[in-house]
């Protein structure tokens, strides 16, 4: 494994072409105390009353060592100590140098039950992310951050967006899909959508949580008992939100809004688009505000990250992508440093050759307005930009 030199010895290399953009990476704090140091004084003990920022025991069966690893790759733990995903330089060594990722989007996982508590917690994470990952540890300029906001109070979310608008490395807004019964297309979210669209920031959603009751959504038949139940059911949330975004008119109210569904895969989107198109054709009189086919809204406004990829052959993926013309809507992701990580070398072979460039790089580069070249890290061998 290649070693990145200390900051004092780092020399930024030549320009190399951006070939892989990872749209789902999870940075973690070294300890709860680190986060506490960024929280307002009156909230420190309220947010971490026991000194633990994560649930101390697994709340459904995950992996055999989930209690010890928090579902993280054991080999991603920094040699100097700490949990996987807590050391920016070691993450850069594994993800940027060894795995060949050119630019990675960092999405912290944090949530809270009460609206104002959630707002404060998200703001705390934003301050930590900006300082620890997007500050001096982003000397290479290859980390991008997700700006976390509360879904429960969109006015506070809009305020947080305004606080970070213009930051050179904050690339998107991040919210939970666990919205307590309010679908994404509801006007409830309009203040947040308006602020995000005005500043050209896509709104991403990723399941998250601080406690067992927040992490696991309640499905029609109750809570999942095992990790595979949970993971297979995850897209159910996204199906509901996607239909609401289209049928409840969010994209008509906010023509510049872009939404990213993270870590739910994408194969579920095709049958949903078919069904929405059929309903729209049959019941246009009931949907006068939906001016185009629902599938057209999806192609223009929605992106899906690829992880977790189903292990099917290239021909199957080609048929899926071509059926609803979704090649321009998929963005590669690894889910580093979780054990469910999809490596770039493995994933790229699943995509049709003529779709690989835009899935691995092009779609994300366009959405997040990323550069076409980056500076090579020590030990990295990329395609030299000309």
Can you say where each PLM-predicted feature lies in the sequence?
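Catalytic pocket-lining loop regions of alpha/beta-barrel enzymes
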Residues: 3, 134-137, 142-143, 149, ...
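Short, well-ordered beta-to-alpha junction loops that form the rim of enzyme active sites
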Residues: 25, 101, 107-110, 148, ...
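Divalent metal-dependent hydrolysis catalytic cores, especially in the metallo-beta-lactamase
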Residues: 73-81, 93-115, 142-148, 171-175
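Mid-to-C-terminal alpha-helical segments outside catalytic/metal-binding sites
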Residues: 2-21, 29-98, 102, 127, ...
């Amino acid at each position: 494994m290649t070693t990145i030199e200390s900051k004092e010895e780092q020399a930024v290399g030549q320009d190399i072409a951006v070939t892989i953009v990872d749209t789902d990476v999870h940075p973690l704090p070294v300890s709860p105390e680190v986060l506490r140091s960024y929280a307002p004084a009156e909230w420190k003990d309220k947010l971490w009353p026991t000194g633990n920022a994560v649930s101390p025991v697994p709340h459904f069966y995950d992996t055999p060592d989930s209690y010890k690893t928090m579902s993280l790759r054991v080999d991603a733990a920094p040699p100097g100590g700490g949990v996987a995903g807590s050391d920016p330089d070691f993450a850069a060594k594994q993800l940027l140098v060894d795995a060949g990722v050119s630019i990675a989007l960092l999405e912290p996982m944090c949530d809270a039950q009460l609206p104002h508590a959630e707002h404060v917690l998200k703001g705390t994470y934003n301050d930590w992310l900006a300082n620890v990952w997007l500050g001096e540890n982003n000397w290479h300029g290859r980390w991008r951050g997700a700006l976390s906001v509360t879904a429960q109070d969109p006015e506070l979310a809009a305020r947080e967006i305004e606080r970070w608008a213009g930051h050179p490395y904050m690339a998107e807004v991040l919210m939970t899909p666990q919205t307590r019964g309010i679908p994404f297309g509801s006007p409830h979210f309009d203040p947040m959508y308006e602020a995000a669209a005005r500043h050209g920031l896509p709104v991403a959603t990723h399941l998250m949580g601080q406690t067992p009751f927040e992490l696991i959504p309640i499905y029609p038949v109750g809570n999942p008992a095992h990790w595979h139940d949970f993971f297979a059911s995850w897209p159910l949330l996204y199906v509901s939100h996607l239909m609401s975004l289209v049928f409840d008119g969010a994209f008509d109210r906010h023509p510049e809004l872009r939404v990213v569904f993270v870590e739910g895969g994408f194969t579920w989107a095709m049958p949903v688009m078919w069904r929405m198109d059929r309903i729209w054709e049959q019941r246009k009189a009931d949907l006068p505000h939906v001016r185009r086919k629902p599938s057209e809204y999806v192609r223009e406004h929605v992106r899906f990250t690829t992880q977790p990829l189903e292990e099917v052959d290239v021909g199957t993926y080609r048929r899926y992508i071509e059926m609803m013309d979704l090649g321009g809507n998929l963005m590669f992701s690894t889910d580093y440093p979780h054990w469910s990580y999809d490596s770039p070398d493995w994933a790229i072979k699943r995509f049709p050759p003529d779709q690989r460039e835009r899935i691995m790089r092009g779609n994300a580069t366009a959405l997040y307005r990323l550069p076409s070249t980056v500076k090579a890290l020590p030990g990295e061998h990329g395609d030299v930009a000309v």
